[in-house]
């Protein structure tokens, strides 16, 4: 139906234009025929002026009608068969692309995880929305602010993405404050990140002498080592370590430099906004504190009550942790150990820095006046399964910084505390650093910095729970969290990770126990079609095995008596 409507629209416009041309032709004849008589007749002259004004108006209308006709033709022309209807790239974008263009865009999307086809066609100096609070105003220029080194980390990033990041930094950072931009290439293989990138660097430096530098790793060393390389190469008072897939917003640097000038021990995170991976639209994110869960995945925390009490939207936000982007006093960051070079690839390194900063004399803040737009990826081509490196790095953080609370990390990943089967590397130098800096305990951190991090006390065992009657199925939370638990084929992922505390069981052997309440036991019974379901029933002697234990349980006299009573 829609194509026929567009055809009707075009025909109607053509008819209107033809009619207007006929009227214009008639008026021109009228003008020619009466040109002599109008000289002697002022009234006739005024009438003709009115007619000619209308003629000019008709001329303008014709132009607009022709434009509409052209747009309608273009609209009809832009309808193409969608080759990749299931691709995330084409859910909101790309319906006007020809089929060969769709193929190019889709292949680039699979390679990079974002829309390189569009990025290559956007201006490098595009304008993005100023997302700061209206209450923020730029104070008079402070020439005494510290200087800034900006480090951009990349590995096989799209060239146009890197160039747009560089351009935004140059255009939106005062030149007297921006000392250098350091690119760190973690062993990229893309050809355009070699000669072509070098040519662009040369071009930038022709306009801004010596501003850009590049460091190239001779092997893949990972995100953390790339950041350390950038820090080592920096020479300004303050260093900003950023991803290369960002665009800084207006006046992003001055509030950070001013805050670090006030307190060199504060490590700053700007507020992230989101650049959508498909259409590159900017989505404004709310200001939030940075936190983490016990698996050390990053998350946003609500703003603390004391921040609201200030009634100042521009005030720094006290934050338990930090995301990947950070700005710090270069020397102070070195004094507390920069980053943990033993981290692999991705994940956990930001949480480690947050813990170390707080426990060793520094602090983390989010600064609402500083905004950076961060390009999201639909997928990470370089690491399809992020959990492998995050899990390994999380254990490393737990062993160095979390003291008696480390079991919570092992519980979150469903790993035994003893012999987890994962090599998290040598941590002796990091433990020595902690001792040298006289750092506070993790208990202090929980109580004074991150009380929202929920601790499960008195845990004696955790993991999957199997009934001795049928050991290939486990207790599962069910299809929806909070739903009625079910028995399901064992897979050991989070819906099946249980935990038990000192008084929630009856010990019968090191790992076999009853679960009971009011003299009834949690057991399984065979259901229809040879499946099993959970029931509370009179104890029949079934036992449960739980995967990992933290300590000896020991029998209690009271529980012995209750269980013996339940058997009669």
Give short role names for the model-derived ranges.
Residues 239:
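Short aromatic/hydrophobic "clamp" motif used to bind/position activated sugar donors
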Residues 247, 251-300, 363, 369:
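Conserved donor NDP-sugar-binding/catalytic core segment of glycosyltransferases
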């Amino acid at each position: 139906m829609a194509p026929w409507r567009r055809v009707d629209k075009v025909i109607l416009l053509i008819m209107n234009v033809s009619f207007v041309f006929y009227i214009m032709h008639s008026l021109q004849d009228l003008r020619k025929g009466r040109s002599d008589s109008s000289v002697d007749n002022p009234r006739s002259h005024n009438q003709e002026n009115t007619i000619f004004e209308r003629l000019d108006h008709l001329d303008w209308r014709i132009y607009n009608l022709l434009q509409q006709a052209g747009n309608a033709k273009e609209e009809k022309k832009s309808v193409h068969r969608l080759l990749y209807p299931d691709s995330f790239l084409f859910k909101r974008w790309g319906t006007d692309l020809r089929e060969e263009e769709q193929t190019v865009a889709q292949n680039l999307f699979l390679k990079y995880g974002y829309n390189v086809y569009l990025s290559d066609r956007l201006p490098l100096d595009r304008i993005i929305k100023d997302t700061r609070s209206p209450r923020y105003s730029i104070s008079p220029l402070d020439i005494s602010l510290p200087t800034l080194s900006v480090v951009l980390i990349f590995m096989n990033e799209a060239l146009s993405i890197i160039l747009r990041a560089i351009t935004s930094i140059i255009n939106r950072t005062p030149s007297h404050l921006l000392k250098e931009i350091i690119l760190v290439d973690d062993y990229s293989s893309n050809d355009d990140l070699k000669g072509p990138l070098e040519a662009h660097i040369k071009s930038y430096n022709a306009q801004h002498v010596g501003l850009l530098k590049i460091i190239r790793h001779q092997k893949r060393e990972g995100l953390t080592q790339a950041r350390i390389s950038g820090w080592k190469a920096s020479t300004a008072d303050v260093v900003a370590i950023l991803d290369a897939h960002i665009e800084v917003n207006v006046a992003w640097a001055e509030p950070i430099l001013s805050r670090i000038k006030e307190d060199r021990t504060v490590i700053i995170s700007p507020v992230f906004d989101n650049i959508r991976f498909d259409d590159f639209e900017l989505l404004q994110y709310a200001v939030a504190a940075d936190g983490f869960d016990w698996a050390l995945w990053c998350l946003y925390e609500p703003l603390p009550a004391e921040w609201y009490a200030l009634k100042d939207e521009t005030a720094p936000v006290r934050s338990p942790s930090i995301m990947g982007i950070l700005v710090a006093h270069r020397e102070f960051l070195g004094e507390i150990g920069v980053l943990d070079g033993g981290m692999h690839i991705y994940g956990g390194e930001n949480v480690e820095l947050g813990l170390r900063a707080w426990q060793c004399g520094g602090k983390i803040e989010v600064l609402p006046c500083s905004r950076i737009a961060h390009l999201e990826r639909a997928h990470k081509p370089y690491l399809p399964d992020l959990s492998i490196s995050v899990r390994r790095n999380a254990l490393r953080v737990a062993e160095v910084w979390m003291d008696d609370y480390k079991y919570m990390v092992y519980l979150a990943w469903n790993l035994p505390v003893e012999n987890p089967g994962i090599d998290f590397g040598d941590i002796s130098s990091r433990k020595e650093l902690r001792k040298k800096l006289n750092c506070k305990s993790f208990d202090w951190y929980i109580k004074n910095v991150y009380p929202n991090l929920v601790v499960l006390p008195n845990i004696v065992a955790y993991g999957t729970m199997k009934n001795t009657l049928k050991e290939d199925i486990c207790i599962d939370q069910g299809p929806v969290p909070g739903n009625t638990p079910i028995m399901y084929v064992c897979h050991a992922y989070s819906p099946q990770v249980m935990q038990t505390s000192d008084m929630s069981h009856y010990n019968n052997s090191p790992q076999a126990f009853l679960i009971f309440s009011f003299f009834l036991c949690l057991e399984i019974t065979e259901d229809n079609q040879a499946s099993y379901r959970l029931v509370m029933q009179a104890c029949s002697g079934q036992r449960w095995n739980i995967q990992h234990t933290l300590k000896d349980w020991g029998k209690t006299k009271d529980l012995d008596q209750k269980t013996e009573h339940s058997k009669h």
